[in-house]
């Protein structure tokens, strides 16, 4: 495919035009009085959102140079979302401000590499200052405040705070769509996985269609069980203890399943058989987790353990197991706390090393089931459009609240960045273009506050100058128009979100300024004339 090449100022201005189009679409959503953006979908209903990364992902520009500029800024939003789960709009606005000021200086003759170095030094110093300003999250109310600001709804913030309070730091909070109106919080007691009983004959509570076994033995097998002769020696040992038996294996079928069902129906022996969750290596890992949690061993020929020679000391124990047709919950497993802690540490290391979002998510779920708990927020609304918008807001707010618990909080409303820059730049010892790069950062750090004020109907420049003179932590409450102690009023941001937004914006801005040549694909004539394929159809008699 033929290429187009742009040099020098033309190259940078083409990229800037693309960046501005994307950033201007995103910036209107910032703050308590920010507006929403409607995104057209090829299939299904349009989406209404105020989430920066969702808007950025949907923007595709026609001009090749502008398209590349927009893609570079998309990367800022995506990276911030991956690291912190929120702050994507702030990151985009910071990137735009850094690039705009930077290009102005490059056009005036500044050395781009000197500017880039100055930007990097200044951002590192501001990040350190933000970390110093950060306060630990000490109360449930503070979690509720940060989640409420992200979601724009105090009821959602309160529910998220309750969920995180129940499941702890390592817990997982998921958001699901519900068929009913409003919000509902569902908490899981113990470890739950999404596989139920193999046969409905195992049910002990006919009304609830559940099999509930108290103080059972738990047999964990990494293979299918079909022959009753393999299972019989163990069944006899368990029956002598008068305890029920839970079997978690790849499958139980044939005469082995028939024997268990017949004994259950006759009342001779209470048991339930459950298929192991997951597939392949993930199934092995989850079975290992269950074994550690219950103090048992995975019976597998890989480690030289055979079903027919299994003894009671290789079985796991738990206070209670509840099995429905779709899921199994293990309550209070009898595993060794030190072994569980070791397994948790191992999973944490795997999360740190993993470069796949999907793998990280699955590992985080395993970690939560072992170390924390699982809370599900069920959200319902009158229409599908409202449901999707609400669900999206809640997911962002959950990420925001988790980030606050992780690294602490700073004053919200764009104030922390502005005030951190005042103290950070007092100690900077730079000269020439590097000093200019630091000044670019100082100017850019006022951009989020200016935009929040502007979206709320105030004069941005006036608000910025007023906040500069206020004590640290004091600033504009854009919802009411008052200048208050932001942390005391509950207007707070997680420092992780604020820091990630700045670092990612600076990373892309520095690269933007050093660009001298842009090479892009030349648009084909066919794409320009009829991208929807109508032209091709016309020649076929349609």
Curated annotation (Swiss-Prot):
It is an enzyme of class 5 (isomerase). HAMAP family: CH60. The keyword Cytoplasm applies. Its EC number is 5.6.1.7. One of its GO terms (biological process) is protein refolding. It comes from the Bacteria. This is Chaperonin GroEL 2. Together with its co-chaperonin GroES, plays an essential role in assisting protein folding. The GroEL-GroES system forms a nano-cage that allows encapsulation of the non-native substrate proteins and provides a physical environment optimized to promote and accelerate protein folding. It comes from Frankia alni (strain DSM 45986 / CECT 9034 / ACN14a). Belongs to the chaperonin (HSP60) family. PROSITE patterns: CHAPERONINS_CPN60. It catalyses: ATP + H2O + a folded polypeptide = ADP + phosphate + an unfolded polypeptide. Transmembrane segments: none annotated. The keyword Amino-acid biosynthesis does not apply. GO terms for molecular function: ATP binding; ATP-dependent protein folding chaperone; isomerase activity; unfolded protein binding.
């Amino acid at each position: 495919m033929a290429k187009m090449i742009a040099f020098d100022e033309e190259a940078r201005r083409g990229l800037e035009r693309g960046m501005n189009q994307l950033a201007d679409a995103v910036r209107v959503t910032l703050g308590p009085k920010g507006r929403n953006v409607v995104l057209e979908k090829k299939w299904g209903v349009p989406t209404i959102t105020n989430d920066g990364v969702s808007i950025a992902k949907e923007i595709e520009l026609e001009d090749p140079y502008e398209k590349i500029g927009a893609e570079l800024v998309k990367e800022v939003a995506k990276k911030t979302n991956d690291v912190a789960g929120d702050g994507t709009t702030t990151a985009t606005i910071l990137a735009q401000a850094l690039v705009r000021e930077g290009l102005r200086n490059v056009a005036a003759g500044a050395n781009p590499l000197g500017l880039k170095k100055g930007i990097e030094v200044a951002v590192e110093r501001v990040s350190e200052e933000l970390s110093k300003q950060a306060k630990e999250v000490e109360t449930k109310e503070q979690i509720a405040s940060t989640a409420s600001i992200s979601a724009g709804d105090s009821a959602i913030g309160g529910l998220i705070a309750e969920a995180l309070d129940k499941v702890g730091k390592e817990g997982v909070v998921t958001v699901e769509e519900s068929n009913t109106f409003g919000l509902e919080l569902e908490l899981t007691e113990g470890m739950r996985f999404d596989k139920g009983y193999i046969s409905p004959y195992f049910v002990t509570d006919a009304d609830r269609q559940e099999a509930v076994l108290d103080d059972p033995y738990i047999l964990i097998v990494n293979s299918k069980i079909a022959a009753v002769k393999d299972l019989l020696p163990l069944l006899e040992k368990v029956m002598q203890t008068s305890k029920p038996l839970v079997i978690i294996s790849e499958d139980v079928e044939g005469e082995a399943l028939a024997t268990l069902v017949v004994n259950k129906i006759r009342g001779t022996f209470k048991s339930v058989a459950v298929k192991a969750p997951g597939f392949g290596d993930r199934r092995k890992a989850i079975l290992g987790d269950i074994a550690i949690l219950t103090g048992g061993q995975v019976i597998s020929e890989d480690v030289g353990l055979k079903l027919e020679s299994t003894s009671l000391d290789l079985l796991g124990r738990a206070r209670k197991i509840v099995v429905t047709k779709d899921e199994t919950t293990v309550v209070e497993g009898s595993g060794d706390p030190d072994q569980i802690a070791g397994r948790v540490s191992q999973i944490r290391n795997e999360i740190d090393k993993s470069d796949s979002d999907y793998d990280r998510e699955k590992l985080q779920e395993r970690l939560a089931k072992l170390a924390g708990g699982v809370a599900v927020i069920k959200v319902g609304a009158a229409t599908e459009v409202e449901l999707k918008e609400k669900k999206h807001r809640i997911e962002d707010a959950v990420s925001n609240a988790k980030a606050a618990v992780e690294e602490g909080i700073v004053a919200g409303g764009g104030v922390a960045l502005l005030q951190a820059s005042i103290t950070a730049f007092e100690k900077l010892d730079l000269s020439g273009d590097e000093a200019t790069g630091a000044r670019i950062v100082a100017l850019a750090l006022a951009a989020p506050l200016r935009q929040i004020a502007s979206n709320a109907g105030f004069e941005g420049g006036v608000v910025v100058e007023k906040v500069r003179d206020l004590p640290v932590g004091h600033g504009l409450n854009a919802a009411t128009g008052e200048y208050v102690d932001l942390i005391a009023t509950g207007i707070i941001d997680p420092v992780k979100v604020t820091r990630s937004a700045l670092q990612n914006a600076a990373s892309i801005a520095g690269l933007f300024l050093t660009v001298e040549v842009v090479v892009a694909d030349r648009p084909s004539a066919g794409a320009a004339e009829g991208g929807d394929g109508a032209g091709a159809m016309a020649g076929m008699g349609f």
